[in-house]
UniProtKB/Swiss-Prot annotation:
Protein name according to UniProt: Neuromedin-K receptor
One Pfam family this sequence matches: 7tm_1
Cytoplasmic topological domain residue ranges: 108-117, 182-201, 271-299, 360-465
Naturally occurring in which organism (per UniProt): Homo sapiens
A single GO BP: response to estradiol
Membrane-crossing residue ranges in chain numbering: 85-107, 118-139, 160-181, 202-222, 246-270, 300-321, 335-359
Single GO molecular function: tachykinin receptor activity
Subcellular location per the Swiss-Prot or TrEMBL entry: Cell membrane
Record keywords, A-Z: Cell membrane, Disease variant, Disulfide bond, G-protein coupled receptor, Glycoprotein, Hypogonadotropic hypogonadism, Lipoprotein, Membrane, Palmitate, Receptor, Transducer, Transmembrane, Transmembrane helix
Spans annotated as Disordered: 415-465
Outcome when changing residue 353 to S: In HH11; unequivocal evidence of impaired receptor signaling
Disulfide bonds: 158-233
Function: This is a receptor for the tachykinin neuropeptide neuromedin-K (neurokinin B). It is associated with G proteins that activate a phosphatidylinositol-calcium second messenger system. The rank order of affinity of this receptor to tachykinins is: neuromedin-K > substance K > substance P.
Amino acid sequence: MATLPAAETWIDGGGGVGADAVNLTASLAAGAATGAVETGWLQLLDQAGNLSSSPSALGLPVASPAPSQPWANLTNQFVQPSWRIALWSLAYGVVVAVAVLGNLIVIWIILAHKRMRTVTNYFLVNLAFSDASMAAFNTLVNFIYALHSEWYFGANYCRFQNFFPITAVFASIYSMTAIAVDRYMAIIDPLKPRLSATATKIVIGSIWILAFLLAFPQCLYSKTKVMPGRTLCFVQWPEGPKQHFTYHIIVIILVYCFPLLIMGITYTIVGITLWGGEIPGDTCDKYHEQLKAKRKVVKMMIIVVMTFAICWLPYHIYFILTAIYQQLNRWKYIQQVYLASFWLAMSSTMYNPIIYCCLNKRFRAGFKRAFRWCPFIKVSSYDELELKTTRFHPNRQSSMYTVTRMESMTVVFDPNDADTTRSSRKKRATPRDPSFNGCSRRNSKSASATSSFISSPYTSVDEYS
């Protein structure tokens, strides 16, 4: 995700070109999340020409200096005022600090407490790791490159910078997709076996392998070029800017549109089932507790997905618009638009821990324990128990043995035996309604079909809350 989005002016030592130079803007590498400058930069840097447009990484116009000006006399002057740099630095610094710390705490809460080790939470660990890595290894480095248009971090990190962000975003969004599919299966067809810990790890490993394959071209074609006075990091595509544009569109489809479509469908079906399928007349505490817990988890994950979609949408729109309408790249505020859209995209890495803390009592208890050293944070005994106690409910089959004999069978006398000794009677036990689970219902038979999504054998409430 190396970029070159800084507003800068090519100025020759004597000032002849400066008056006619064009600001190089954020859009020169709007692929901050997917790659940076390539063929166009080589054209810009290796050939002399009048102040004219050459295609950049995304097919955007960049300014070439006049032929009379030697490269040695060209300087890269950053034109943003210091107060604006300070504000952007503070904004990006907050994202990095909150994202790294918050996601590391989420990982600790899940892995350090046995009660939290559920299928959904294993995917949340993968999501937290992806977000923390993105914030730690990409956000600040990319921001520095965007501000100064100079690569300070070497050729190897240039490859990593162009390669890893796509990998991390892919892992994040498909971890959310895996959670959506798992919630769908658990609620719509609860009698099917759930993913085991081993199967969950295989799914997570497969997500990362696919992410590496998608991002590999960015690593393969990454290059650095040392120019007089500065170094650039870019992706040089063999077939030029059009190939990069095609690749970026493919990335948008695979890491944004397609997974959001899948999650939209699954959560819509799950939402209709949970909020529209309550059984009339059911007063069982177990039923209502599981229903409430499932609703909370689904609501939390819907908010997580919507946050991701909203944060990344302006960035993708920015790239598409600046690629199609190239004159936008000469707008004097385009760098600020880029920095704002990139900040919003990167800020998606810091919201999830906040959402978990606000909407899930066990994560909230975990965050309290993590910050118990703060004088204004009080950890109650209830918070301690939240991360230690596991509550299991019996399944429908086991609950039938807890009711009385009178409730579980009906004795029927055979009239053909009336002439025999009165003490000799044949008893036939009529099986009880298998939908009965100890809850009082007005019509258990009519409710049995609807209740299948609520209870599965030996289900822990921890799976849903």
